[in-house]
Curated annotation (Swiss-Prot):
Its EC number is 2.2.1.2. Its main location: cytoplasm. It is an enzyme of class 2 (transferase). Transmembrane segments: none annotated. GO terms for molecular function: aldehyde-lyase activity; transaldolase activity. Pathway: Carbohydrate degradation; pentose phosphate pathway; D-glyceraldehyde 3-phosphate and beta-D-fructose 6-phosphate from D-ribose 5-phosphate and D-xylulose 5-phosphate (non-oxidative stage): step 2/3. Transaldolase is important for the balance of metabolites in the pentose-phosphate pathway. This is Probable transaldolase. It comes from Chlorobium limicola (strain DSM 245 / NBRC 103803 / 6330). Keywords: Cytoplasm, Pentose shunt, Schiff base, Transferase. The active site is at K91. It catalyses: D-sedoheptulose 7-phosphate + D-glyceraldehyde 3-phosphate = D-erythrose 4-phosphate + beta-D-fructose 6-phosphate. The gene is tal. It holds the Pfam family TAL_FSA.
Amino acid sequence: MKFFIDTANLDEIRSAAELGVLDGVTTNPSLIAKIVGDPSNFTYGDFKEHIRRICEIVDGPVSAEVTCLKAEEMIAQGEDLAAIHENVVVKCPLTIDGLKAIKHFSASGIRTNATLVFSPNQALLAAKAGADYVSPFVGRLDDISTDGMELVEQIVTIYDNYGYPTEVIVASVRHPQHVVTAAMMGADIATIPYSVIKQLANHPLTDAGLTKFMDDAAVMKK
């Protein structure tokens, strides 16, 4: 299983990369907004420069999302984003216009990530249109009392049934169990907030054992 980090924070990306477990990055407009003090002073050029800086840190796919709704506009912006760096993957929402853009990018050799996916039908359409990645948002489904991980299982089964090469990125991850369950289901990738990446390393018995070892080591003769 591959681990992506779901953030636009450069310090978090660097810290995750230092752990040796980072395979890529996903961003979206909301994550970009979190790191911008005053959005009115953050230009599209600033956005592209920020994506470029992320690509310099991580040697892997970096998803950058389009910020328009019409297919023609998505295509124009997506081509511009893809030109930033060879690792850029263009994120398109799973809409009718998004599918048109994904089809265009697939034919042009530009990698895509179909995002805001909440149903197996949407995931099937994404694969047929040629998306390289599909991002089911499990946490947001859990928020409305729906089993987000059941959707992941359905998508993995459908893709396995027909041999679709589209990789499943489990997104909107809220806690370590999302990651573990995704791995058990055979999802290709989990994109994880930095806080959850750190939680994956924690266990109370590890802490207790370390405390005991250090206490015992302290009484040993130097």
